Swiss-Prot record:
A cellular component term, taken from the record's GO annotations: exodeoxyribonuclease VII complex
Protein name: Exodeoxyribonuclease 7 small subunit
UniProt-listed HAMAP family: Exonuc_7_S
Protein species of origin: Enterobacter sp. (strain 638)
Function: Bidirectionally degrades single-stranded DNA into large acid-insoluble oligonucleotides, which are then degraded further into small acid-soluble oligonucleotides.
C-alpha cells in the first residue's frame, strides 16, 4: 500500500478519506501491518482536520471582532 503523506486538498477531502479509513479498519479484513498504516494515516488526517477547524474558528472570531464595540464571543455549540 503506498504511503500517503500529502495533505488533502480540503477539510472535506480529509474527512472523506478519514471515513474511508475507518470503514476499512472496521471491516477487520486488513492484515496487521496494513491496519497500522491505515491507523497512522487516520491519526494524521484527524490532526490536520483539527488544525483546519481551529484556523476556521479563529477566522470567525476575527470577523466577528471587526466591530470596534463588540467583544469576540467564543463559539459554543448548543447542547441538545
Amino acid at each position: 500500500m503506498p504511503k500517503k503523506n500529502d495533505a488533502p486538498a480540503s477539510f472535506e477531502t480529509a474527512l472523506n478519506e478519514l471515513e474511508q479509513i475507518v470503514n476499512r479498519l472496521e471491516s477487520g479484513d486488513l492484515p496487521l501491518e496494513d491496519a497500522l498504516n491505515e491507523f497512522e494515516r487516520g491519526v494524521q488526517l484527524a490532526r490536520q482536520g483539527q488544525v483546519k477547524l481551529q484556523q476556521a474558528e479563529q477566522r470567525v472570531q476575527i470577523l466577528l471582532s471587526d466591530s470596534e464595540d463588540a467583544a469576540p464571543t467564543p463559539f459554543t455549540p448548543d447542547a441538545e
